[in-house]
Amino acid sequence: MFPALYVYWLFPGALILLAYWVFAQWQKRHTASALTLTQAILFAISSIVFIVWINLWHYEQFILAFAALAVTSICLFMLYLTYPLTENKMNGRLPISIAFAAIAFLAFLTIGFLFISNNLIDFGLSRQLWAVVLLTCAAALALAIRFHRYDAAFPAVFIWFLIGVAIANNFNELLVTTAALFLSGVLIVGIIFIRKRLPANANKKRL
């Protein structure tokens, strides 16, 4: 269920977007749309814990690394929720959305890695079926974000990863490749056709 190596080039891109986001927040620091204390704390925690994750993964402390990745995902999700539903801009929610999506999918991949490395694959399901289950859960999360948060960027990142999974398997594992392509198609349809009327408070910024 692991993607082709090219997909990981998304992470340097996400870091560049976050660097621009930080610069944009600095420019807005004296305006009404300035970063709140809650947002600053959540971003700082997620950044620090992600650095910790890099070190834990490097030293093969995989379970602790997953815990750090989970904390990073939670902090980014909480930061993501502080933004209005309509603020899909480069200096607003968009960089956070892309970073959150990349970290969330990385968490799903880490779960799969832990299952394989610790021989936890059981319950009568093959490795391929477990991969399909995890990919389906990932796609369900992306669709939920698309529907409830009016966000096309989040599922787009998941499509990038899912296509990478299909390319990496190259039809050697037909079930996983087919599932990855099918779920990519579902997410594309979701991005294009999912429409829901914005609530009255859609432009309200949370603390």
Report each predicted region and the residues it spans.
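Alpha-helical transmembrane segments in multipass membrane proteins, preferentially the mid-helix core
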Residues: C75-P84, F105-S117, V132-R149
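Membrane-interface capping segments at transmembrane-helix boundaries
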Residues: F23-H30, T82-L85, G190-L207
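Central hydrophobic cores of alpha-helical transmembrane segments
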Residues: A152-G164
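Short aromatic-rich membrane-water interface segments that cap or initiate transmembrane helices
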Residues: M1-L10, G92-S97, L120-W130
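Alpha-helical transmembrane segments of multi-pass integral membrane proteins
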Residues: L42-I54, A68-Y80, R93-G112
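Membrane-interface helix caps and helix-loop-helix hairpins in membrane proteins
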Residues: V52-F66, L85-M90, S117-G124, I145-H148, ...
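Early transmembrane hairpin module of multi-pass membrane proteins
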Residues: M1-F66
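Alpha-helical transmembrane segments and their membrane-interface exit regions
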Residues: A70-L81, T136-A139, L162-G164, L183-I192
